[in-house]
Amino acid sequence: VERKVLYLKPGAKATAGLIEAVSERGREGDLKSVVVASTNGKTAIKLGEALKDVAEVISVTEFTYSDDVKKSMKKLGIKAVEKADLPIQDRRGMREALMLFGAGVKASLEVASVAAEKGLVEGNVIAVAGTKGGLDTALVVKPSHPDDFNNPDPSKRMAVLEFLALPRQG
C-alpha cells in the first residue's frame, strides 16, 4: 500500500489538512476509532464533525472540559476522558525519545494508551495530537495498556503502524 505522509507546519492552520487526511484514512473502513489529545475539546469537536459517519472519536485531556464543550461532544457522540493520567510523561527516556519527532507524536501515543487502559478501543486506531492550538500529528497505532510498554512479548506492546501526518520541525 502506498501512502503519502503530510508534513504540516505546527499550529491551528494545520488542523484542516490533518482532518482531511484522517477522514480519508478513516473512510477505508478498517479502523473504528480516532483518539485525539485535545486540551480544551475544540479540536476534538472539529474532528467529531468531520468523522460523524466514519469513526468514533475519543477525546483525552489531563484537564476538565467546559459544560458547553461536553454538550457539543455528547451531541456528536464523542467519548471524553478527562483528568487523564498521561503515562509517557513520567517515563523520561521514552518521553524525550518521542519528543525528537515532535510533541504531537508523544501525545498521540499517550492518548492511544489512555484509551486502551480505559477499555475504550479495540484493534488499531488513528491517534491524533498537535501543538500551538492545532492538530499536526496523526498515526495509525496498535495501542496498548501502559503496563505493556516494555512487555517482552512484542504482540502486547504498542506499535506505530503508519504515519499519516507529522509536524515539520524547524
What is the predicted role of each segment?
Residues 34-44, 61-65, 105, 130-135:
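Gly/Ser/Thr-rich loops at beta-strand to alpha-helix junctions
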Residues 49-53, 74-75, 140-146:
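Short, solvent-exposed amphipathic alpha-helical segments in soluble enzyme
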Residues 126-170:
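Glycine-rich, aromatic-bearing surface loops/beta-hairpins
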Residues 1-35:
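Glycine-rich phosphate-binding "P-loop"
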Residues 14-20, 107-112, 159:
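Active-site glycine-rich loop that binds ribose-phosphate moieties when present
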Residues 3-5, 54-98:
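Long, charge-dense
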Residues 77-83, 88-136:
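Long, charge-patterned amphipathic alpha-helical coiled-coil/hairpin "stalk" segments used as oligomerization
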